[in-house]
Structures are given as structure tokens and as C-alpha cells.
Amino acid sequence: MKDVMLSTRAKAAVRLALDEDLADVADARKSKWCDATSEALVDPEAIATGEIYAKGAGCVVAGATVAKAVMKTVDPKIKVTILKPDGSVVKPQEPILVFRGKARSILAAERTALNFMQRMCATATLAKKFVDATKPYGTLILDTRKTTPGLRVFEKYAVTCGGGTNHRMGMYDRVLMKDNHRRLWKGGDPDELDQAVVAARKKFPKLAVEVEVESLRECASALKAKPEWIMLDNMSVADMKKCVRMCKGISKTEASGGITLDRAKEVAACGVTAISLGCLTHSAGSVDLSLEWRAV
């Protein structure tokens, strides 16, 4: 699991989030960061030790390195120790990370650090539930592009912290022909999907090609060109099983379309290679995290 903070996009997003909280909205570039409350009430030389922990059970840690980066961006002298690395499952009130430094700096970074972590932990925790539910079948749990604008790198990283697997990062790293593409290809003829695969490979020979299908007929058409993946969209269990048999030895299969945790095991039992889930990044919610002082 590669540290998300190695990404230049992640570093830029952390800076933007801090600007949002600490810089004058009129001109963030020229504005000095300011936490007015702390500057008014807290001794500038006061040193404090604090910790972040989850209040509920079963939280999967994600974003500990992000919280550390937030703290260090505000004040490089803050000492941060990660006690529970990303991917760990923690008990209620079990410290995830501990930090020591100027109290003003910690207070300035607090909310931004928690905002990142509480959402990332929620995504990781939900991903783990799906991974655990489908574990007997070895089914991959994939995310989607249904992410918060500007925060995709964090949300997709959080999925991996919960044991999930990243689907394509964007529209540039895989050809994925969905329903709206199909309608624009050869007048939407379901028997011409193989030719769409051929055209995609000709244009982007190094990229994997995936075709979304909604029927056995469309699946059979696409399979003639042997795409790397077939996405089975909103299919019944019976049709999914048939498509899996058709695709065996030719293409990997991905089940998609509003699959809930209650249905995940049944879908996995169909033999699909993977299940993709928009809910991991658009509906996971947030985990209740708290930052508390250990010593002031």
C-alpha cells in the first residue's frame, strides 16, 4: 500500500484544504494563515501533546499519513508518531497517532486533519465490510470514479486501506465503454460491440478495454473481440451466472449497479472476478474521530 502523501496531487490538496480553513478567502495566496481564536487566547510558546482516536468500534485506519502531513505543513516542528498505521483496525478510544508541538499549531491543523481522516476511515471501514463478505469467493472489491472532486487520490487510497482494489484512476488509463458510448457507436447496435473493442484497441493499443453490457446478447457480441473486462451492469443473478460462463477463459467479469452489502455475497457466488461499488466513495459517510490533549 503506497503512501498517498507521495502523490503531488495529495500534497496540493492538503495545502488547498489548509488555505480553506486558515487563509483569507479574498486572496489565499497573499494571506497569512490565521487561527484567530488560538492567536487571541493561546500562549504562542505553549507546548502540548495530543492524540487522535476513533470513538466507535471496528474503525479501519486510513489517512494517518495525511493527518501527519497536515500537521507538518502547518508547523514542521510538530513531532508526529503514528501508532496505528493505515489498514489497522482500532478499538474505541485507542490512539491512532500522537503529536507534540506548539499548541497553536496543533489547533490550527486539527480540523483539517480530522476532516481528511474521518472520511477516509469511513471509506476504508466500508470497503473492509465488502471484502470480508466476499472473501470466501476471492472476489475483488473495486471502487469507481464516483469520488469527491479533487479528493479522488485520498478516497481511492482509503479503499485499498480496507482491502479493496482500485479500478481505473481516471478516464485516461483504461477504455471503458458504457451505455452512453454504446448508443453513439454504430447507432447503438448491440451486435457491433466487438467492432468497438477493435476500434478502441487500434487507438490505444496499450490500454485495457472494458465493455459494459446489459444483456446476454451484448455480452456475446463484445466477447467476439476478447476485451480484457466485461462489466455486467444491473443484471439478475441468473444472467450474471450465464455471462460468467460465457466469459470464462476470455474476459474478466465485473458486476456493477447498486450492489448492497446484503447482496454482495450472492453476487460474488456467481463467480464474477470483481464487484465495483460507487458507495465506497460517495456514500460511506464519516467515522467519529476526536482529537484530545494528553498533556498541556
What are these regions (language model features)?
Residues 1-225, 229, 241-246, 252-254, ...:
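Acidic/glycine-rich phosphate/pyrophosphate-binding loops and surrounding catalytic core
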Residues 233, 252-255, 295-296:
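Short, structured secondary-structure boundary patches
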Residues 234, 257, 279-280:
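Short secondary-structure boundary segments
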Residues 236-240:
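Nucleotide-binding motor/catalytic cores of P-loop/tubulin-like NTPases across gene-expression machines
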Residues 279-296:
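Short, charged, intrinsically disordered terminal tails
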